Amino acid sequence: MAIGYLNIQARTAHDAVPLSGVQIRIFDFWGNSLYVLSTDENGETPTVPLETIDKSYSQNPYFSGNAFVSYHVLAQASGFNSLYVSDIPIYDGETAFLPVTLIPMQETQRSPLQTEISIGKPAVASHEMRHQEGEETEPRILRQVVIPNPITVHLGTPGSSARDVQVTFPDYVKNVASSEIYPTWPENALRANIYAIITFALNRVFTEWYRSKGYGFDITNSTAYDQAFVYGRPIYGSISRIVDEIFNEYVRRQGQHSPYFTSFCNGTSVTCNGLSQWGTVTLSNQGLSPLEILRYYYPKDVEIAQTDIITGVVSSYPGTPLRMGSTGLDVQTIQTYLNRIRRNYPAIPAVTDPAGSFQNSTNAAVTKFQNIFNLTPDGIVGKSTWYKISSLYAAVTRLAELDSEGTSLGIGTVPPSAVLRQGSRGQDVITLQYLLNVISEYYPSVPRPAQDGIFGSGTAQSVMAFQRAVNLSPDGIVGPRTWKALYDTYQGIGQNVPLPSPEPDGGTIRYVVRSGDSLWLIAQKYNTTVDAIKRLNGLTSDILNIGQVLNIPSSGSAPYFEYTVR
């Protein structure tokens, strides 16, 4: 029998917090226990082999059975609700990486609940008809092609009451590709399909296809309207590697700016005017390149374009890979990010090289980071590694900032008595918005509201999403029951989520203020707070002057270095 592989990664808060000691049980299709594992300090289990069937079955469009063997996983941890994932497809020669996102138990919760997710066969093996509609241009469109990070996915048909989840764009594409096609397909077939998936999603965002109709999401997971997405499913190594390389590349027609509407179907039981998923396998086996495959199904003048506008990223990729011997501000940025990330992931070694100089310790930290997050462990900071480091840095620093805010607000243990609804304003609304911001880090279906003290439509949507998540009537009104649930959830997070390593005593960074700087931007970049900068420098206001020298608290290893914004 053929062999495939399974690796489980238990994390929470957008990967900012690895969960060690999670008990993982792997069962075969009939429920027999095969492995009992425990996650390490990175939240990861060893990769285990599992029997499956030969990959030739998943490369044959006429095979009517399951081209894989299914397994089930149960994840349990003290202080967290449990997760059971069934019908996980394991393919010949492929490693399935299963993300286990556990939800902290509420403060008053006596026993864990169990969430169940079923995976099953990919959409290409389904006979469901597709009715994908879209345009290359719309009266209401964005001016630039932007990678939405995160992208908001509605887990149902457009008009259904299903929940929305937010995921990073690369993770979304990996999920869709793993849900749509077989990971055992030839390389160029995989690439052509992934280009179509990326471009389809970017077309929905660019034309504001759903948001212009009043919906609060970017795309659905309904294959009748959009493309498959199974929240909580495993991602396959062959797909993950390609997406990391091309997630910001898309298909457009020559002379046009907008992402082409790349409709597709399986091409066997369902036919369409767009790309045939099974047809890409035949064309790839004939030696066609990904672009040639795309031009076979779409207009002959389509081309591959790239956008570097990615929302939610602290620093954009400099355009040139960083490696041993590289120097400069970009190297310094990565060193700062890695030294902060290692507080949450202590297996990453400390960067002790001089600031801005890519030497042995930087190489070791980069390589370990790549190993932990399923990137090619070559020690080179290319596009995929840069954006993953940047994304994780944003996640860990956001948690630290929220913790600092909670101390400043003095949340306490007794909820406010005021009943809040859309139109309310004031300190209680700020408290509400803060609680929702914290909860949104651990509950993927709860969107993050702006913290402005005004109960607007965004806060109302967040409240209703939270109410659905905790089985309250989603009326958008914050009365006693909702306040209690908010506090129970918030206190449960504080009690059950492991804290990162304490910040080491570091030196300071001398920072020369330049045009466009603000205390908030500087604090975000160096993982500190505005208050900490003001205290260290004896500032009584937020006003900065160009050329002013500030001392910035540093968690890095170098005691002092001078940094000037370019």
Language model: regions and residue ranges:
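Short alpha-helical segments in extracytoplasmic peptidoglycan/chitin-binding modules
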Residues: 276, 283, 335-338, 365-370, ...
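Short, acidic Ser/Thr/Gly-rich low-complexity loop/linker segments typical of extracellular
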Residues: 32-59, 345-347
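Short, ordered, surface-exposed loop/turn motifs in non-cytosolic proteins
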Residues: 14-34, 38-41, 331, 429, ...
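Conserved, single-site charged/polar hotspot
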Residues: 1, 21-25, 38, 48-50, ...
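Primarily a LysM-type cell-wall glycan-binding module
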Residues: 332, 353-361, 430, 452-458, ...
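A short, amphipathic beta-strand motif
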Residues: 4-12, 100
